[in-house]
């Protein structure tokens, strides 16, 4: 059974991370487990920027976005001697267990520590929803709400001015943010890695929607990294249709903001489950959702799992047909 637990957040921040941290701290205290907070991800493990959670009122962050303990990408952690330093720091403080909240890169780090004898649990924290071992990642719902709110505002002004807007959203190769926000906003064009469109195809959609069907606007939602320069795509559409077209990059706004209720609830349940897993002496596993249940998957399996590109393509095709009809 765990006696001292440390928590870190790693990689890109996501709304809801603070809620997971809060419930890990409070659940641990109920079971008499001492909790420590690692600041700035794996880098903090190596530099020993670790504080006792008793010094912090975690309840004050229940409605705050981001992660109050900070996060970082730390490529140095791939080196064995660097990881050994991290393990040494944990041992010196008597910490035997670690909960890592982050994406697949964070999971990889947790697995490496597990192999060095540290009990580790991974929680899925990323707005991209790109961890195939879970149906839902901490941050997805709030990021979707942020995208939808921005697209709704864009629709107002695009309708007023008879314009086209191409909105780039995050995803890290996964299409969930584009697909789901496209469904929620009625975007006439949705482009993901699994469902790509040429510029000529988008031009034909714009002509059909705004000239043949006399719609006042077209919204396209595009996953990041599909096109080298979305502004050039927008200009080509404008040049070939005569309809003013703008590229909108939402960028890091998607990662910020107060976590929505659904986010807080799911993150909290995962935090509780993380402590319960450690109480059962589990290690080297990633927790996630399947339906309404929290499941446990060995981290190597979680890293190998892949979402179906075919399913995504079929879903986006259906949504595009509905939104263009």
Swiss-Prot record:
Taxonomy of origin reads: Bacteria, Bacillati, Mycoplasmatota, Mycoplasmoidales, Metamycoplasmataceae
User: So what does this one do?
Assistant: Catalyzes the phosphorylation of D-fructose 6-phosphate to fructose 1,6-bisphosphate by ATP, the first committing step of glycolysis.
A Gene Ontology biological process annotation? fructose 6-phosphate metabolic process
Q: Name one GO molecular function term.
A: identical protein binding
Residues recorded as binding Mg(2+), renumbered to this chain, are 104
Q: Which Gene3D superfamilies match?
A: 3.40.50.450, Phosphofructokinase domain (3.40.50.460)
Active-site feature positions: 128 (proton acceptor)
Cofactors: Mg(2+)
Specify which residues bind ATP according to the UniProt entry for this protein: 12, 73-74, 103-106
One Pfam family named in its UniProt record: PFK
Gene assigned in the entry: pfkA
Work out whether the entry's keyword set contains Hydrolase. no
One GO CC term, this protein: 6-phosphofructokinase complex
Keywords from the named record: Allosteric enzyme, ATP-binding, Cytoplasm, Glycolysis, Kinase, Magnesium, Metal-binding, Nucleotide-binding, Transferase
Q: What is its EC number?
A: 2.7.1.11
**Biological source species:** Mycoplasma mobile (strain ATCC 43663 / 163K / NCTC 11711) (Mesomycoplasma mobile)
Where is this protein localized, as stated in its record? Cytoplasm
Please report which protein family the annotation says this sequence is part of: Belongs to the phosphofructokinase type A (PFKA) family. ATP-dependent PFK group I subfamily. Prokaryotic clade 'B1' sub-subfamily.
Please describe the quaternary structure of this protein: Homotetramer.
Q: In which pathway does it act?
A: Carbohydrate degradation; glycolysis; D-glyceraldehyde 3-phosphate and glycerone phosphate from D-glucose: step 3/4
Q: Which InterPro entries match?
A: ATP_PFK (IPR022953), ATP_PFK_prok-type (IPR012003), PFKA_ATP_prok (IPR012828), Phosphofructokinase_CS (IPR015912), Phosphofructokinase_dom (IPR000023), PKF_sf (IPR035966)
Reactions accelerated catalytically: beta-D-fructose 6-phosphate + ATP = beta-D-fructose 1,6-bisphosphate + ADP + H(+)
Activation and inhibition? Allosterically activated by ADP and other diphosphonucleosides, and allosterically inhibited by phosphoenolpyruvate.
The entry's protein name is ATP-dependent 6-phosphofructokinase
